[in-house]
Amino acid sequence: MASSDVKPKSVSHAKKWSEEIENLYRFQQAGYRDETEYRQVKQVSMVDRWPETGYVKKLQRRDNTFYYYNKQRECDDKEVHKVKIYAY
């Protein structure tokens, strides 16, 4: 794992849905920028994912409550533009 204070260099908003956007949506719903920040904060090496789809299955928020996600897509088209894509 890299430095514990990795900061994004830029941010943009998603334009259309993809599997990457779906997972970013799930991390951001739980209060994290992306998988990089989640792994830094929670000190985990693996994120629980659905084997069939590869989507994030379960995330632990900063207040230690859990978010559980379905196998299917959860990010509706009307929510896609709210997803932020961070570049490091």
UniProtKB/Swiss-Prot annotation:
Q: Which UniProt keywords apply?
A: Differentiation, Spermatogenesis
Q: Which GO terms describe its biological process?
A: manchette assembly; protein localization; sperm axoneme assembly
List cellular component terms (GO).
cytosol; manchette; nucleus
Q: Which domain of life does the UniProt lineage start with? A: Eukaryota
Q: Which Pfam families match?
A: Meiosis_expr (PF15163)
Protein function: Essential for spermiogenesis.
Query: Which family is it part of?
Result: Belongs to the MEIG1 family.
Describe its assembly.
Interacts with PACRG. Interacts with MORN3.
Q: What is this protein called?
A: Meiosis expressed gene 1 protein homolog
Specify the species: Homo sapiens (Human)
